Amino acid sequence: MLEGLFDADRWSTTFQNMGPFWEGFGVTLQVVVAGLLLSLVLGTLLGVFSTTRSRVLRAISRVYVEFYQNTPLPVQVLFMYMAGPQFLQAITGADQPVRIAPFVLGFLGVGLYHAAYISEVIRTGIEAVPRGQMEAAQSQGFTRAQAYWYIVLPQTFKIILPPLCNQALNLVKNTSVLALVAGGDLMYRSDNFVSLYGYLQGYIVCCLMYFIICFPLAMLVQWLQRRSQERPRGVSLAGLGLDNVEEA
């Protein structure tokens, strides 16, 4: 079979069937964008919860993170695929299970999963911001929510950009789990091609297409890491009365 990797006829057949690969590439990109948005919003919310004074909010964040970090993503997606339609039938009162589109399964699966990891990144970033920033903001009349929104989170995202991009990379690669539920993604299309023709060229094309998505992100991570090492650690917030605040 390995000798066939260099077979011109097999490559010709592969190139003649690139349409499904590009369709899968498009589906994967859509799942990546939607999953990233979901994981960023939910992860930020959970990250803030984990640093609040409320025991209830901290507990919600902790339970969520522990559950998603300690159960496999394929199991989570398969569970949503099998149980989700019955759950929707129960809450909507439909006569039969409500079908969930593979795209929805995909972005919910990777989005909810990576929100747990992003929340930990957010929490670490928030804890890296001097606590005096929050106290100084509140002394200037900011509510706690306003202090998070205008003071803490902007600094947090500057600190955590490199690890955040790493999570984006992992999310891209984890979209391949959609192949388990016939999601129409890149991995699913590649599996179909290899099953039909028996040519490993399908997986080579799949790898190259994932590389097209992931390599620019990897370069962005390296660039951000260099920038973060060059950037001065002090943060000036002139105009808000919060510049040069030291950690309490």
Which positions does each model-derived feature cover?
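Transmembrane alpha-helices and adjacent helix-loop boundaries
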Residues: M1-A248
